[in-house]
Structures are given as C-alpha cells and as structure tokens.
Amino acid sequence: MSLDHATVRRIAKLARIRLDEEEVPRLAGELNAILGYVEQLAEVDVEGVAPLSGGAQMALRMREDEVTDGRYPDRVLANAPERIGDFFAVPKVVE
C-alpha cells in the first residue's frame, strides 16, 4: 500500500494537523515506511504462537475509587490554551 499526497493531506485534515505543503512529501515517505513495516509484520508466520495480551504477566492491586479534585487543578488548567471555568475548552471536531 502506498499513500499519495492527496491521501496524506486528507489524513492530516481528519487528524486536525496543519501541514505546510513542503511537509507533505516527507510525511508521505514516513507513513509509507511505517505501512511497509506493518505489511512485513503481516507476513510473519505466527502459527502456534499464543497471543500476548500484555508485557508483564502480574496481578495488579485494586484500590478503592475516590473522588478527588486531582490535587492541583489550577496547575493543570494553567496548561490550557483556553478554558471555560474549570474545564479545558477545545474546538468542536464532530460535525
């Protein structure tokens, strides 16, 4: 599979990533390299290999749920480019 420049622009638009026109060929090359690697992985014979669901096979401790304010909401919200009250303001992405 190979992505053309129009497809790269469409992916960027859907991901809400602003691309300059000179970035499109470089990004197309990088994405095509990634897709090529994924195609190689699809060709690997995994007959008889048990599926892996996680890296470490250990039991995790459960903890009680508790409602908190995050301990430092003002510091967290200080990173927001825009906020409405105590919430991050984000652009609408679903039409």
Swiss-Prot record:
Pfam families: GatC. It is an enzyme of class 6 (ligase). GO terms for biological process: glutaminyl-tRNAGln biosynthesis via transamidation; regulation of translational fidelity; translation. Its EC number is 6.3.5.-. GO terms for molecular function: asparaginyl-tRNA synthase (glutamine-hydrolyzing) activity; ATP binding; glutaminyl-tRNA synthase (glutamine-hydrolyzing) activity. It comes from the Bacteria. Keywords: ATP-binding, Ligase, Nucleotide-binding, Protein biosynthesis. The keyword Protein biosynthesis applies. It catalyses: L-glutamyl-tRNA(Gln) + L-glutamine + ATP + H2O = L-glutaminyl-tRNA(Gln) + L-glutamate + ADP + phosphate + H(+); L-aspartyl-tRNA(Asn) + L-glutamine + ATP + H2O = L-asparaginyl-tRNA(Asn) + L-glutamate + ADP + phosphate + 2 H(+). Heterotrimer of A, B and C subunits. Belongs to the GatC family. Allows the formation of correctly charged Asn-tRNA(Asn) or Gln-tRNA(Gln) through the transamidation of misacylated Asp-tRNA(Asn) or Glu-tRNA(Gln) in organisms which lack either or both of asparaginyl-tRNA or glutaminyl-tRNA synthetases. The reaction takes place in the presence of glutamine and ATP through an activated phospho-Asp-tRNA(Asn) or phospho-Glu-tRNA(Gln). This is Aspartyl/glutamyl-tRNA(Asn/Gln) amidotransferase subunit C. It comes from Acidiphilium cryptum (strain JF-5). The gene is gatC.
